[in-house]
Structure formats: C-alpha cells, structure tokens
C-alpha cells in the first residue's frame, strides 16, 4: 500500500472540491490523525482499575474559575456610555476646589461662562458615575442570583416551614385558578391543599417546628436569634450594643464565641487596639480566599450540567470548529509491558529506544499496586518524551497550548501597557504611596510582573506618550550596556566595536527625543569646505 500523503490529498481537494475520496483514503486519513495507534498484541492480560473523576473535577474547576473571573472583571469594569471615559468623585471635588481657588486668586467671582462650563463638566462627571454604579449594581445582582450560594434563598430554616407552606399553597392555588378553568381549579386546589398541605406539610411542620422552634439548625448549641430577641431582659445602657450584636447570626456567633473562650480576650483586645496590623493578615487578598467568597449554588451546577448534556453534540461541534483539539480525544490508556521496579528507569529508557518508531504518545511509568495521578502536574509534564514523528498530532496540540499561553501573556501585557499610558495621560502619574499600598495588600493577587518598574517609570516620565516611553526604554538599555562594557578592564575587539556602536545608538536616540510626534526626521549631509556636516530637517507626517 502506497504511503499516505496528506499534502497531496489537500491539494487535490482544493483544486477540485467535487472529487470523491475513497473509503480506503478516509481510513488512512483517520489512522493518520488518530493518536490511539494499535500496539503489538499480547496474549497476557493485565488487571487494572481507573477512575474518571477528573472530568467532574474539571467541570467544577472551570465553573469556579469562571465565576471568580466574572466577579473580578465586574469590579474592574467601567461601562461605556456616550463618553468613553468615566470620571470619579475625586475629579468632581477637584473641579469644585478649582472654582474656590479662582475666587480666592482673583478676589472676585469668575465669569459666568467659566462657572457654567465647570458646573456642566462636574454634572456630567456625576451623571457618568451614577450610570456606572447603576450598571454595576444591576450586573452584580444578576451574577449573585445565579453564581453565589445564599442559604436564605436555597435552604429555608425549619421554623419558617409553616409560613412557607401556607404562602406557597395559597400562591399556587391562586395562580392555578387564574390560568385554569373553574371546575379543574376547584378540584386541583382541593386535592393539592388536602394532600400536600394537610398530610405532608402539616405533619412535617408540626414535627419539625416543634423540635426546632428553640434550636438554631445552623448552630444547634445556641438559641435562635428571633427567640432570643423576644426573651432577653436587657438594661437600657446595653440595649444598643445588644441590638447590634444580635442583628445578624455572624455577629451573635462571634460575640458568643469570644465570651466562651477566655484565652481570646487578650488577643481580641490587642487586635482592636491595632486593627491595621491585624487586618492585612486576617483579610488576605489571596485568590483562593477571594474565590471562596463566591460559592456557586448546587442548582447552578445542575443547570450547567443539564445545559451541557442537552447540547453535548452541538457543543462538541462548536468546540471542534473553534479550537484545534479533536473531540474524540477521550480518556484512554494502553499497557505496553511490565518491568522490574528496581531498574525501572533503565528499562524504560531501553524500551523507548527499542520501540521508538512504534510508540505514538509519551510513555509514563506506573508503579504496580499504587494509584498514579495522571493530571497535568509539573512532575508528569517533565517526564514527557517525544522520539518519533508518529506523535506529531498530540505534540502539536501541547505545543499550540504552550504557544497560546505565551501569546496571551504578551497580548495582555500590551493591553495593560497601553491602558496605563492612557491613564497617565488623563490623570497623571501614580500617587507616591500607591506602590507601597500595592506591595502591602496585593502581593499574591492580580497581574504581577507584566510591566517592569523601568517601563512604568518611563511611561510617567513621558507623560503617557508611548513613543517617547519606548525611546526612554531604549536609552536605558544603551546606557546599561555601555556601563557593563566600561566596567571591564580589557575589551576584546568585538566588545570595542560593540561599545562604539552602542554609543552611536545612544546619541541617535537622544536626538530622536526632540522629534515631534507628528513629524518625520530627515538627516541631510552638506558639504561645507570639503567637510561633511549633518543637518536635520523635519517633514510633516501623514496620519
């Protein structure tokens, strides 16, 4: 059988799309793209066990990370309306201060046109801020309804069962009567209320509520707040404090726990005396803590799983058309051989080179009698070996994944760089204390290390002008290179040549700083008494 040539097949299809492809060619094409190549059969049988719980974990991991990203993006999002920029209350106060300053400097009220202009700008700023707040509030409400577990919405306490049953039955009957004819409604309401409300709900409520009326289901050791608030005999001087403590479950539990644990009294006293020292420690900004504050309810997972299962084929087809991964890359494994564990690595290396032309994918060593984690751990990734052309499909997938990560990081870095430049142009450089604040409160969260200190410094030096900031970066690199070369005692000829070249580049870069943004510099050489002198002209740039 002739060797299959996929390039020739593609060429023929492009030249004549109506050309029929034989079944044998399709089989060869499938075998070429199928990573599960058949290995040499063996009469021995290996007994093994495996679990596929990773798929369920990946779904939850994706859901958790997606929810965390959405809430984080909402915090950083600034909606766009008629104006692309949105001014905060800080600028509003600055405008008011400007009006007061003008009054003081001129000892007179500014002209009516100036005042009206400033007030108009201030009013627009206030309007934009209000619109942004309203939009964020609406989106936050939507996200919390679907993505945040709220026990008050998803699990009612037992002592509210009676009122819940009554209101549910009444509303159900009312809505049913509105949509159904009278005869049917009468029978439905009667049977529903009789069966559900009397038999089920009444008995359940009676038994449960009787035993839990004076018990907090979420904290059985303590009396529920609604009971305590009715029975407490509080002196007038303590009434305000007791009301504040018993207003929420969290406050009551915290106070009760502190009172019952004497060893905490001194520590709590120190914490209240120095809250700034304790707050960064107890309320850290790690991403794990942030994600744990947004726990998706179980019904969201159910709805998401239902959506995937109901549209599984369509989702696979869409994923296949968007991404390079094939949808038939399911979980699978093959056992090649069994070797003595005392010389495991040596045997594996020998196996690699002996069967390198037949092995399609990477080979991993698995200790018999022990569970082996197959996840994408660093130790597992370092063991991957590629020896032949048969594994090109999987290798391309992994290489593409690594390349996408690099490209995505560079795109994100450029986006941050341009947004930071725009921010400096609009509001000026960062406040002096911002770097200290970020180092104190944002050490483990957010984007770290994408922009260097030198880049930020040069952006501020250039007042947000990206062209000049790049030139400052180049000047710093040249000066650093010259400094390194001059620090050496004896330079090689190549290093001397590099030093002279770098000095010229530095000189040209310093001259380019004076070139306006809307012009192009043209160097001209003029013969002056048999001596060439450089003159510089500027021409208008076409934007």
UniProtKB/Swiss-Prot annotation:
<feature type="repeat" description="3">
    <location>
        <begin position="169"/>
        <end position="172"/>
    </location>
</feature>
<feature type="repeat" description="4">
    <location>
        <begin position="173"/>
        <end position="176"/>
    </location>
</feature>
<feature type="repeat" description="8">
    <location>
        <begin position="189"/>
        <end position="192"/>
    </location>
</feature>
<keyword id="KW-0677">Repeat</keyword>
<feature type="region of interest" description="13 X 4 AA tandem repeats of [CN]-[ATV]-[DS]-T">
    <location>
        <begin position="161"/>
        <end position="212"/>
    </location>
</feature>
<feature type="repeat" description="1">
    <location>
        <begin position="161"/>
        <end position="164"/>
    </location>
</feature>
<feature type="repeat" description="7">
    <location>
        <begin position="185"/>
        <end position="188"/>
    </location>
</feature>
<feature type="repeat" description="2">
    <location>
        <begin position="165"/>
        <end position="168"/>
    </location>
</feature>
<feature type="repeat" description="6">
    <location>
        <begin position="181"/>
        <end position="184"/>
    </location>
</feature>
<protein>
    <recommendedName>
        <fullName>Protein B602L</fullName>
    </recommendedName>
</protein>
<keyword id="KW-1035">Host cytoplasm</keyword>
<feature type="repeat" description="12">
    <location>
        <begin position="205"/>
        <end position="208"/>
    </location>
</feature>
<comment type="similarity">
    <text>Belongs to the asfivirus B602L family.</text>
</comment>
<feature type="repeat" description="10">
    <location>
        <begin position="197"/>
        <end position="200"/>
    </location>
</feature>
<feature type="repeat" description="11">
    <location>
        <begin position="201"/>
        <end position="204"/>
    </location>
</feature>
<dbReference type="GO" id="GO:0030430">
    <property type="term" value="C:host cell cytoplasm"/>
</dbReference>
<comment type="function">
    <text>Plays an essential role in the assembly of the icosahedral capsid of the virus. Allows the assembly of 3 molecules of hexon protein p72 and formation of a thermostable trimer.</text>
</comment>
<keyword id="KW-0426">Late protein</keyword>
<feature type="repeat" description="13">
    <location>
        <begin position="209"/>
        <end position="212"/>
    </location>
</feature>
<feature type="repeat" description="9">
    <location>
        <begin position="193"/>
        <end position="196"/>
    </location>
</feature>
<feature type="repeat" description="5">
    <location>
        <begin position="177"/>
        <end position="180"/>
    </location>
</feature>
């Amino acid at each position: 059988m002739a060797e299959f040539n996929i390039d020739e097949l593609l060429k023929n299809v492009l030249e004549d799309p109506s050309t029929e492809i034989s079944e044998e060619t399709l089989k060869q094409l499938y075998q070429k793209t199928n990573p599960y190549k058949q290995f040499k059969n063996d009469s021995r049988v290996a007994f093994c066990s495996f679990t596929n719980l990773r798929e369920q974990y990946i779904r939850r991991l994706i859901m958790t990370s997606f929810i965390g990203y959405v809430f984080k993006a909402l915090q950083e999002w600034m909606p766009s309306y008629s104006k692309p920029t949105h001014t905060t209350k800080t600028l509003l106060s600055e405008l008011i201060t400007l009006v007061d300053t003008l009054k003081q400097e001129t000892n007179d009220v500014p002209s009516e046109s100036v005042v009206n202009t400033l007030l108009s700008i201030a009013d627009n700023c206030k309007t934009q801020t209000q619109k942004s707040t309203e939009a964020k509030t609406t989106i936050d409400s939507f996200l919390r309804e679907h993505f945040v577990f709220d026990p008050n919405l998803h699990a009612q306490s037992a002592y509210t069962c009676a009122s819940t049953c009554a209101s549910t039955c009444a509303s159900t009957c009312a809505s049913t009567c509105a949509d159904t004819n009278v005869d049917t409604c009468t029978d439905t309401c009667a049977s529903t209320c009789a069966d559900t409300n009397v038999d089920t709900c009444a008995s359940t409520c009676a038994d449960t509520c009787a035993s839990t009326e004076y018990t907090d289901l979420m904290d059985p050791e303590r009396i529920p707040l609604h009971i305590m608030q009715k029975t407490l005999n509080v002196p007038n001087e303590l009434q305000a404090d007791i009301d504040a403590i018993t207003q929420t479950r969290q406050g009551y539990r915290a106070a009760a726990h502190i009172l019952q644990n004497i060893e905490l009294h001194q520590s709590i006293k120190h914490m209240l005396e120095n809250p700034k020292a304790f707050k960064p420690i107890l309320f850290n900004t790690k991403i794990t803590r942030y994600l744990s504050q947004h726990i998706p309810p179980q019904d969201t997972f159910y709805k998401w799983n239902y959506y995937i299962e109901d549209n599984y084929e369509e989702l696979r087809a869409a994923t296949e058309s968007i991404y390079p991964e094939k949808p038939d890359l399911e979980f699978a494994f093959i056992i090649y051989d069994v070797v003595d564990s005392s010389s495991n690595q040596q045997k594996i290396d020998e196996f690699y080179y002996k069967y390198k032309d037949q092995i399609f994918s990477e080979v991993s060593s698995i200790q018999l009698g022990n569970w082996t984690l197959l996840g994408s751990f660093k130790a597992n990734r370092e063991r991957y070996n590629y020896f032949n052309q048969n594994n090109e499909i999987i290798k391309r997938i992994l290489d593409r994944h690594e390349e996408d990560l690099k490209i995505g990081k560079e795109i994100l870095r450029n986006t941050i760089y341009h947004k930071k430049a725009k921010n400096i142009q609009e509001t000026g450089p960062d406040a002096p204390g911002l770097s200290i604040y970020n180092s104190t409160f944002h050490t483990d969260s957010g984007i770290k290390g994408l922009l260097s200190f030198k880049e930020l410094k040069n952006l501020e030096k250039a007042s947000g002008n990206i062209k000049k900031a790049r030139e400052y970066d180049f000047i710093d690199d040249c000066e650093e290179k010259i400094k390194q070369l001059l620090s050496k005692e004896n330079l090689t000829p190549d290093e001397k040549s590099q030093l002279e070249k770098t000095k010229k580049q530095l000189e040209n870069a310093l001259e380019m700083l004076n070139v306006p943004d809307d012009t192009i510099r043209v160097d001209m050489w003029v013969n002056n008494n048999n001596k060439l002198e450089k003159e510089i002209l500027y021409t208008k740039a076409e934007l």
